[in-house]
């Protein structure tokens, strides 16, 4: 079977901890989401979908394996536990002839675990990754170091990853992790293997708390 002619390209936009009702399309008065609204108008909106587990890592494991928490072995926020899943959403796409690409956050462990991604432009939150390896740098850190002349922090002082206090991003907007994730996703599409369809995961760290 020629995958180029029988399978459409697939892009999965995967934000972190985005409330299901935070779309202006759904009538939320406090947020403006014109680009996501456009996708809603052109596609299908599922308003009665629920996560099998309410915590980040465990929900991600269910999402990419198609299994429930009992089967994945993750019922809560169990960080630092290796992801040993031989069959994932990405391996299924890869085995079907797709080029599998990630741009942004995955929150796997180890952070560089690909789990079926052939191309991985990785963002890993600085405070998370360096808990396990003080010298760890993801692709975004390398980019930020180059652009800022050595500064690699991707957050601001005194701002917790799960707190309520916020501060202004200290760098230019194009250096923000969300902007980098989008840029790498676009670059991945432009440089993809033209002989194969592609599956692209676009993993945004935001609007994860405190935002």
Q: Where would I find each of the regions flagged by the language model?
A:
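Formylglycine-dependent sulfatase
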Residues: 1-211
């Amino acid at each position: 079977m020629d995958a180029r002619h029988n399978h459409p390209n697939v892009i999965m936009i995967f934000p972190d901890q985005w409330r299901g009702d935070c779309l202006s399309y759904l009538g939320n008065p406090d947020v403006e989401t014109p680009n996501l609204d456009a996708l809603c108008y052109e596609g299908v909106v599922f308003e009665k979908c629920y996560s099998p587990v309410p915590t980040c890592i465990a929900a991600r494991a269910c999402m990419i394996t198609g299994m429930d928490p009992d089967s994945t072995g993750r019922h809560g926020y169990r960080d630092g536990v290796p992801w040993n899943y031989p069959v994932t959403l990405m391996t299924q796409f890869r085995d079907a002839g797709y080029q599998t690409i990630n741009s942004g956050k995955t929150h796997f462990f180890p952070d560089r675990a690909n789990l079926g991604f052939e191309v991985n432009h990785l963002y890993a939150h600085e405070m998370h990754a360096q808990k396990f390896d003080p010298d760890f740098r993801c692709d975004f850190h390398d980019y930020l170091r180059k652009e800022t002349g050595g500064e690699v922090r991707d957050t601001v002082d005194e701002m917790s990853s799960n707190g309520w206090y916020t501060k202004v991003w200290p760098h230019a907007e194009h250096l923000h992790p969300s902007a980098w994730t989008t840029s790498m996703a676009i670059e991945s599409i432009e440089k993809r293997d033209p002989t194969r369809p592609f599956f692209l995961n676009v993993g945004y760290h935001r609007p994860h708390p405190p935002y």
